Structure formats: C-alpha cells, structure tokens
C-alpha cells in the first residue's frame, strides 16, 4: 500500500498549508503538491493509499484539507485516512 503523509504541524500559516503538502512515493523528494494538484492525483489514484495527516494547534488548514479529502473519497474508495493528533 502506498502512503502519503501530510504534515500540517510544520506549516506556519494557512497559506503554507494550502501550497505545501506531502508527496507520494515515487515522486521527486522536492515535489510538494498544491491542494488542487493533490485533489486531481487522489481522484485518479487506482491503488490502495493510506493518507496520514498530522495536525498541530492550527486547525484551519486541517479543516480545508479534510473538506477536500471527503469530497475525493466520494469518488475514490481506494483511500484510507489516518489522522494523527499532535499538539505542537
């Protein structure tokens, strides 16, 4: 199973969170997808994928991310979400 880790703890502002997410295995190490790019990738994903989301004290970015993921999950049942609660 492929895995993507979206670490919101390291992002300082909501703008950062909307621009920089984790990368999928096989992508270059410096690749950071924007939210809309991530949406397109996940909608087309055809293998099981585990998505780990690490959040901190700022839940604004988390809320926007979860809205997008819930929307994608309605069209792609290969996605498994694991939310890791971490208070920075």
Predicted regions and their residues:
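Conserved NTP-binding/hydrolysis module of P-loop NTPases
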Residues: 4, 12-30
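Walker A/P-loop-proximal flanking segment of P-loop NTPase domains
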Residues: 1, 24, 40-44
